[in-house]
Structures are given as structure tokens and as C-alpha cells.
């Protein structure tokens, strides 16, 4: 499948359709509840998806309302992060480039960056470099410590209340259960690898 996001979205096709019927009302409700500190995120459902290597990747399925909350927080973070990373766009970093508030899409169109990435590879090869390193960074997402994330978001000057709320959300979304266990286990690390709404 060429678009990994399509697989994630397939789990929610009916939910997205139902949400869309009254999306304005739903979004206003989420906002109102959030402003009153009453919106409570739900635990994520975990799905294990086979990787080409034969290993399994855990994907967190967040309910639609939680996806919107997550996206709203990520938008705030991305805006601040862009101020620090923009100078590296299409020079050292070529993937998942934040498009900015004014864009309809979260990321810059990848095809343009890919052309520049390919040109950069050719330039490096012409300069005598003959090795390429390939990393599976998505495996890293499960190990991101929430205390470390808090530290770096604070360094970015993200509002502390927003960071604390995000950490509470992440704690719930990344918790685990035993198959017969009576309650969730909160381990304080990881960020959901789905939704990929911020990559769409």
C-alpha cells in the first residue's frame, strides 16, 4: 500500500463519515469542553500491524475527537518548532516539513522536497560520498520518554498548561493492558504512531 495513512483511515471510515455530518457542532463542543477543562481523552485501542521484517508495529487508534485534540496540540508545537528548524528545510531535512498555519495541509508537498533530496544525494555522491544510512525512526516513537518530551517542549516555549495537558493525553493513549488485566498500565513513554493526521 503506497499510503500508510490509508490503512489507518480505513479503521475510521464510518466514524469520519458520522463525525462529518455535524463536524462544526462536534468541534465547537470539543473546544467548549476543553476551555472548561472538562474534555477527557479516552484510552487508545492498539492494533498490531505486520512490518515487512516480520515484526509487529503497534498502532494506537484514537477516537475521532481525540485525533482532533491531538492535532490541535501538534499544530501549536509545529508552529514553534518551525521557527527553529526552517533554515534546515530542503537542505538537511527533506521529509515531513511543516507547511505553516496558512496552508490547508500540515506538511509541504513531499514531491518537491523529494526532488531536492535526490539532487542533494547526487551532489554528495559527486563529492565522493559513497554510503547512505537508512533509519526506521518510527520505532523510536514508542520509546520517547514523556519527561524528556516535557523538557524539550518547555525549551520551545510551549505554554506549560498545554504541555501538561499533552502529557496527560499521551499517558492515557500509550498505556498498556494485560489480556486479562483489570486495569491499564501507565508507563510514561511513547507517542501514538497513528493518527497520521499531521502527516496528511
Residue ranges of predicted features:
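Short linear interaction motifs
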Residues: 40, 50-56, 114-117
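Conserved polymerase palm-domain catalytic core
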Residues: 119-200
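Non-catalytic, polymerase-adjacent accessory regions of viral genome-replication enzymes
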Residues: 1-50
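Conserved pre-motif C helix in the palm subdomain of viral-like polymerases
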Residues: 56-92, 141, 186-200
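A short, surface-exposed helix-loop junction/capping segment
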Residues: 6-12, 50-55, 182-190
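Active-site-proximal segment of RNA-dependent polymerases
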Residues: 74-134, 139-145
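Short, flexible active-site-proximal loops enriched in glycine and acidic residues
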Residues: 40-45, 83-88, 161
